[in-house]
From Swiss-Prot:
Homotetramer consisting of disulfide-linked beta subunits, or heterotetramer of two alpha and two beta subunits formed by non-covalent association of two disulfide-linked heterodimers. Interacts with MBL2 through its carbohydrate moiety. This interaction may inhibit its catalytic activity. Interacts with TSPAN8. It comes from Rattus norvegicus (Rat). Its main location: membrane. This is Meprin A subunit beta. Residues 1-20 form the signal peptide. Residues 431-585 form the MATH domain.
Length: 704
């Protein structure tokens, strides 16, 4: 833009921003270009010819993943290669946290183990299926693959899972419209029997993160997959998070009995209130209720939608006695990681002077009764609605979480209520953006800006929620001018902003939150050649907060297709007409170099050369055992393959037939032997009897 036009542009932009309308060009950069590309779209545009769109097959072809030979250990070694984009590295680590929260699968940096997963920036997004025992097993997170559910999807392949729609019973649930599929891509819709992949007796899952979308490999604009239950037509192909059935299958496959970082969840639906106890060190008690006259009218878990259910814990402050306290303590918990996050919803129907204190009671050898430590004091609690709170803990000994309600002075008609408590060994989000009356905003087709926030490094930022589209919701991250700008490094280097639309399911393990991350690359330039992440006062536009304070807002960076409005209205994103967006901005500059590897490196080529002369039959897979190539043969519950090349098939039925035949044969032989023995014995005694008779006759003759 010509320099003499710049002041007029600022005036015009300021007018639009103040009026609540978007600035020219919305002053944002859409990293998706307005197109919500799935994994298979990305790979197709790159011209990749991968099995089922994102699976790398070994030379032996499609292998069965039935049997323990194809499982990884519960802790999987990995390397993040330096070729990966910085944003992708951070997203991968966040995906690992989702695995830890919901399964017993863990990940550790490679330290010389025989087999490990090497994550690199290849062409597209793809993985092998199962542990192929190749030493270095590659998994590609290429350009535009740096979305958390995409990473989860590819690692599920590596853990041994095929796509949901290829399972043996899929024709009972979906219809494949073959004439709408791209020519030459029909094989991506093949169906496979239980000898190749096992559904683990879990129902067909329309919501699986491993399912194709309805538009997969289409040759036009019409759907290639039609669900037999029409309500799931726009559900299949979700790329937000694991579904419940995804987790059930994964936990069954790896015999998980618990998840690694999850600690506790309580919605107070059961009378035992999740093992929580009333303290003896207070002057009142918390009560389990489903409604309070002064509010809340219903719990947060069910929002009054389920009859005879919907409970929360309530501390009554209407007595008017200032300083009255009630302490509710969790069951004893045992930490493993040294950091935890407590999440809960709080409702204030009393006076503004009431407060909630969150403590930990930590038990050590020297303090058998526990040491009470204040972790957070919550004052000035808004009244009339449920509010979400997070409390960060750093506990290393066994402990309890303690909720203390404190009544304020003066008259009060209500009290404090808590519901939907979750405790996990994860990092709490840094900030919460609570948007109320969201349905009204959604219908207004407007752009909404968050309040200003600060990152842990001191950078000021703002989030832009774009509701102007009738079908999609956009989400953008802006740096803004702040109090620390003179002391900060510019252009802003390697700050990763993670923005999460919260699925408000009461149990953190059952959520399918929608998340997107972007990272500030200090070398990234804008269309006019200026650094995108430079100081906002230098490259931004003038804007105003609602109170009239002026500031500078840098260009937004994000996506116009963050989520469809249809998905936004599903699950529990929108609850009580409230939406929560969780925000974390952290420095990931330490991830610049991650590929240092120790000792001798097992190479894929050695394994492939050894197996190149071996052809395993019937879905067997070639592996190295002490340097020798051997076929690992697939097996099911009542069948198996055997032999040097898995060329022979055995089954329980065959074994029974053989066993019965052998038994009959042995019985027949024994019977024959017995009959012969009896015959010979009888013949022997007949001869003796005949000889004795002859002797007696001779004696009688001599007597005469």
């Amino acid at each position: 833009m010509d320099a003499r036009h710049w002041p007029w542009f600022l005036v015009f932009a300021t007018f639009l921003l103040v009026s609540g309308l978007p600035a020219p060009e919305k002053f944002v950069k859409d990293i998706d270009g307005g197109i919500d590309q799935d994994i298979f779209d990305i790979n197709e545009d790159l011209g990749l010819d991968l099995f089922e769109g994102d699976i790398k097959l070994e030379a032996s072809g499609r292998n069965s993943i039935i049997g323990d030979n194809y499982r990884w250990p519960h802790t999987i070694p990995y390397v993040l290669e330096d070729s990966l984009e910085m944003n992708a590295k951070g997203v991968i680590l966040n995906a690992f946290e989702r695995y830890r929260l919901k399964t017993c699968i863990d990940f550790k940096p490679w330290s010389g183990e025989e087999n490990y997963i090497s994550v690199f920036k290849g062409s597209g997004c793809w993985s092998s299926v199962g542990n192929i025992h190749a030493g270095k097993q590659e998994l590609s997170i290429g350009t535009n693959c740096d979305r958390i559910a995409t990473v989860q999807h590819e690692f599920l392949h590596a853990l041994g899972f095929w796509h949901e729609q290829s399972r043996a019973d899929r024709d009972d649930y979906i219809t494949i419209v073959w004439d709408r599929i791209l020519s030459g891509k029909e094989h991506n819709f093949n169906i496979y029997n239980d000898s190749v992949s096992d559904s683990l007796n879990v129902p067909y899952d329309y919501t699986s993160v491993m399912h194709y979308s309805k538009t997969a490999f289409q040759n036009g604009t019409e759907s290639t997959i039609i669900t037999k239950i029409s309500d799931f037509e726009d559900v299949i192909g979700q790329r937000m998070d694991f579904s419940d059935y995804d987790l059930l299958k994964l936990n069954q496959l790896y015999s998980c009995t618990s998840s690694l970082s999850f600690m506790d969840s309580c919605d107070f639906e059961l009378e035992n209130i999740c093992g929580m106890i009333q303290s003896s060190q207070d002057s009142a008690d918390w009560q389990r209720l489903s409604q309070v006259l002064s509010g809340p009218e219903n719990d947060h878990s069910n929002m009054g939608q389920c009859k005879d259910s919907g409970f929360f814990m309530h501390f009554n402050t209407s007595t008017g006695n200032g300083g009255v306290t009630a302490m509710l303590e969790s069951r004893v918990l045992y930490p493993k990681r040294g950091f935890q996050c407590v999440e809960f919803y709080l409702y204030n129907s009393g006076s503004g002077n009431g407060q909630l204190n969150v403590y930990t009671r930590e038990y050590t050898a020297g303090h058998q009764d526990g040491v009470l430590t204040l972790q957070r004091e919550i004052r000035d609690i808004p009244t009339g609605s449920w509010q979400l709170y997070y409390v960060t803990l750093q506990v290393t000994e066994k402990f309890r979480v303690v909720f203390e309600g404190v009544g304020g002075p003066g008259a009060s008609s209500g009290g404090l209520s808590i519901d939907d408590i979750n405790l996990s060994e994860t990092r709490c989000p840094h900030h919460i953006w609570h948007i109320q009356n969201f349905t009204q905003l959604l219908g207004g087709q407007t752009t909404v800006y968050s309040p200003p926030f600060y990152s842990s490094k001191g950078y000021a930022f703002q989030i832009n929620l774009d509701l102007t589209s009738p079908t999609n919701v956009g989400l953008y991250f802006h740096l803004i001018s702040g109090a620390n700008d003179d002391q900060l490094q510019w252009p802003c280097p390697w700050q990763q902003a993670t923005m999460t639309l919260l699925d408000q399911n009461p149990d953190i393990r059952q959520r399918m939150s929608n998340q997107r991350s972007i990272t500030t690359d200090p070398k990234m330039t804008d269309d006019n050649g200026s650094y995108l992440w430079d100081r906002p006062s230098k490259v931004g536009v003038e804007a105003f907060f609602p109170n009239g304070t002026q500031f500078s807002r840098g260009r937004g960076y994000g996506t116009s297709v963050f989520i469809t409005q249809e998905r936004l209205k599903s699950r529990e994103f929108l609850k009580g007409d409230d939406v929560y967006i969780l925000l974390t901005v952290e420095d990931i500059s330490h991830l610049n170099s991650t590929a240092a590897v120790p000792g001798p490196v097992p190479t894929t080529s050695t394994v492939h050369n050894a197996c190149s002369e071996v052809e395993c039959q019937n879905g067997g897979i070639c592996t190295l055992q002490e340097g020798r190539a051997e076929c690992k043969c697939p097996a099911g519950e009542d069948w198996w393959y055997m032999g040097k090349r898995c060329e022979k098939r055995g089954s329980t039925k065959d074994t029974i037939v053989i066993a019965v035949s052998s038994t009959v044969t042995v019985f027949a032989v024994m019977l024959i032997i017995t009959l012969i023995s009896v015959y010979c014995t009888r013949r022997k005694y007949r001869k003796k009897a005949s000889a004795k008779t002859a002797a007696m006759n001779l004696e009688n003759q001599h007597a005469f």
